[in-house]
Amino acid sequence: MKRERGALSRASRALRLSPFVYLLLIQPVPLEGVNITSPVRLIHGTVGKSALLSVQYSSTSSDKPVVKWQLKRDKPVTVVQSIGTEVIGTLRPDYRDRIRLFENGSLLLSDLQLADEGTYEVEISITDDTFTGEKTINLTVDVPISRPQVLVASTTVLELSEAFTLNCSHENGTKPSYTWLKDGKPLLNDSRMLLSPDQKVLTITRVLMEDDDLYSCVVENPISQVRSLPVKITVYRRSSLYIILSTGGIFLLVTLVTVCACWKPSKKSRKKRKLEKQNSLEYMDQNDDRLKSEADTLPRSGEQERKNPMALYILKDKDSSEPDENPATEPRSTTEPGPPGYSVSPPVPGRSPGLPIRSARRYPRSPARSPATGRTHTSPPRAPSSPGRSRSSSRSLRTAGVQRIREQDESGQVEISA
């Protein structure tokens, strides 16, 4: 009995200690490994600038870690691999001179390109540790948004029009997202306001007077946000618009008619002035040629008159019709009585302009020629009906004319010599 009681007591004690033994058996033993942390999981980079993929690791080992950065694609691309900060192997050409490693395992990428965008994975391991630490960081690379502008076909619209379209346009920028503002506030939900799938185009259907306002758009991407200048959209009532358009059309028509009416006469007057100028030039050229020819011929005619005074007298006698009708009175009218030894010669009406001008100074005549002049004055008058008398009168007239021409030539020579 005593033996049975002792066995039961030992068994009960063993059952009491079994939970503690079980706990000791299932408690895990701490394993050595690398723990990696990162302050950010998403980094936004700008083309041409730098991005820091920051990480930190902890380990019980004091050895240098082996760090490996990869860019996850369909086939992972190794960016860099190092022991501590010392690069192992050769870098890819597209990453050469653009990366830098730090002691905590962080990676700095310089001169970012659009191709650098993606998910980066870092692996850090130490030889004494059993497990390797891993961490992923997402990197986006974008181009900043340039200032947008709202494009419209016209800033004025007629009330109750079918549709009116506004387009938000910009030159540069990647991954843009668009937001429309009315009077600086986001558009309210309205069935008349229709947006394109990318929200770049705003269409207002059945325009109302309340749509008369300032409109602008905001374009943004992960690295920038830019707002356009507002555009004023003016909505006219149909009646007022008709008045404005009709008035403007009438004014434009009147202006065109006035311009056309003024332009045509001016064109004709220009042609007329041009023809008159040409005619005047031709007339002046003809006058110059005629004056030159007259200047060449006048001196010669004067010389011929001096050389042949009888011919000049005959020509003048033919031109005149009075000497035959009153031959007795004409010699007296041509000469006037004067002091003895002087005679006054009448001016010759048909004298050529080429002859020299007589001086006002008078010179005494030769006494040998005065009787001829006296005979001319003392000749008795004859009846005009007698043929013999007309012949003698014409002869005396010719003699007196020749005598006067000779006296004029002599006086001209005396004046020239003086």
From Swiss-Prot:
Ranges per topology, Extracellular: 34-240
Chain positions covered by the region annotation Disordered: 271-418
SUPFAM superfamilies, sorted: Immunoglobulin
Pfam families listed in its UniProt record: Ig_3, V-set
Transmembrane segments: 241-261
Keywords from the named record: Cell adhesion, Cell cycle, Cell membrane, Cytoplasm, Disulfide bond, Glycoprotein, Growth arrest, Growth regulation, Immunoglobulin domain, Membrane, Phosphoprotein, Signal, Transmembrane, Transmembrane helix
InterPro entries referenced in this protein's UniProt entry, alphabetically: HEPACAM_domain, Ig-like_dom, Ig-like_dom_sf, Ig-like_fold, Ig_sub, Ig_sub2, Ig_V-set
GO annotation terms (biological process): cell adhesion; protein localization to cell-cell junction; regulation of cell cycle
Changes after translation: N-glycosylated.
Main subcellular location: cytoplasm
Disulfide bridge partners, by residue number: 168-217
Record domain Ig-like V-type: where: 34-142
Residue positions with a glycan: 35, 138, 167, 189
Recorded topology in the membrane: Single-pass type I membrane protein
Amino acid composition bias (Basic and acidic residues), ranges on this chain: 287-308
Cytoplasmic domain ranges by topology: 262-418
Gene Ontology CC entries for this record: astrocyte end-foot; cell-cell junction; cytoplasm; plasma membrane
Classification via Gene3D superfamilies: Immunoglobulins
Chain's role: Involved in regulating cell motility and cell-matrix interactions. May inhibit cell growth through suppression of cell proliferation. In glia, associates and targets CLCN2 at astrocytic processes and myelinated fiber tracts where it may regulate transcellular chloride flux involved in neuron excitability.
Stored PANTHER family: HEPACAM FAMILY MEMBER 2-RELATED, HEPATIC AND GLIAL CELL ADHESION MOLECULE
Subunit structure: Homodimer. Dimer formation occurs predominantly through cis interactions on the cell surface. Part of a complex containing MLC1, TRPV4, AQP4 and ATP1B1. Interacts with CLCN2.
UniProt free text on domains: The cytoplasmic domain plays an important role in regulation of cell-matrix adhesion and cell motility.
Name of this chain's protein: Hepatic and glial cell adhesion molecule
Organism: Mus musculus
Designated gene of the protein: Hepacam
